[in-house]
């Protein structure tokens, strides 16, 4: 009797196993064939991941699926799909995958960008928006005008543009974040900030760390997990700088992000180092990406002087030759606005952005997207989608005048979009408008056998994409403009009280004008 029962039970188990094997497979989006255990990892080493995914989008469609280790990954290759999923279904698609190296090891769970969607992230977001809402950003414009004046003055005397762009961007961020300008660009602070930026770029690069692909490895003892020691060194160095900057900021008499955020009731319940991180990564991220975009602008200017000439003619018509462009000119310079958008599209600084994670099962266009799937909106594939951007490899600002509704993916999507995007666009407007007012930009060639400008040669710097090294000549458009900039900077350097500019951003007691007392429009 027992033998009969055993045979029957075994037969039933075999039936269930066969039915399991024959079950309908989950209808994930199409993608390249996968190997057991590693999935598609073996296909990612020969080319940058953004290029490989663009090839797969051409082969399999605008929505593709990959397997990286044990993780399902869905990569989006069109702005419409990105809006449908990340914008319209933001409540479902706003979390983050498990960043073991970045979130758990290097930043101890303090980095806003790696937090899963939930109450803690919303708290971080509210604190960030207290200094990045449109009302505050508008009142930062005097600081941006002052810093941009120093930038164009420096470029009159050097063609080494990258350090000048980086100083300008970092000085804006540390000035507002901590009340500490970087007037020279060789301050100890800037070198430490650049080191930390480099670390963050590396830890956020998709597929860099084996422990992110196989999280169980993080349970190994430190002797067998050398990345833990690396992470601890990075964390200690980062938090030491953030603590020093915070102490300096709190000692300032002028307004800054640190003092504002520390004054919020919401910050009182958080560990002090978590608040230090919140401000620190705001200062770090903005300086890093803005500098890269200005490098990309310089490349575009050297390669396409005819497009810059159109923008210069527009600026000259509106501004004239006896003053610099200012924020009062924004609405009068549509071609310049289109040129800035095209710079962001043509060479995206972060071709993959930061991945999202879907929090519950979803279906899109007949495909099943399981909960926990990593979602990547590939800015590279989106920006070079010929259905949205005809002749996508052509640098053509006119496309944004012909269709003002063309998307801009540079700042991300949905609820995890960059909260500093309004400030970033203001920074790009004032710097690029003043550079074009002052200079013609041309390539520098040492000899006839020198290679051409690297229009499509890039260097992956962690999660950021930089143009391959190149040289450019910044020459004043005429002697009048050169003398004007020198005179204006001499006067500003002597008379402008920068701390007073910081204090004017949010007067004591919140004494804004009647117009500014209206509810500010916050970043989504």
Curated annotation (Swiss-Prot):
Domain of life per record: Eukaryota
Main location: membrane
Signal peptide positions on this chain: none
Listed CDD domains: CYP64-like
Chain sites annotated for binding heme: 418
Molecular function terms, GO-annotated: heme binding; iron ion binding; monooxygenase activity; oxidoreductase activity, acting on paired donors, with incorporation or reduction of molecular oxygen
GO term, biological process aspect, one: terpenoid biosynthetic process
Phenotype on disruption: Abolishes the production of all the drimane sesquiterpene.
Subcellular location: Membrane
Topology within the bilayer: Single-pass membrane protein
Transmembrane spans: 2-22
Co-factor(s): heme
UniProt cross-references to PROSITE patterns, sorted A to Z: CYTOCHROME_P450
Function according to Swiss-Prot or TrEMBL: Cytochrome P450 monooxygenase; part of the gene cluster that mediates the biosynthesis of various drimane-type sesquiterpene esters, compounds that exhibit diverse biological activities and are widely present in eukaryotes. The pathway begins with the synthesis of the backbone drimenol by the terpene cyclase drtB using farnesyl pyrophosphate (FPP) as substrate.
Full protein name: Cytochrome P450 monooxygenase drtD
Protein family membership: Belongs to the cytochrome P450 family.
Keyword Iron: yes
EC number, UniProt record: 1.-.-.-
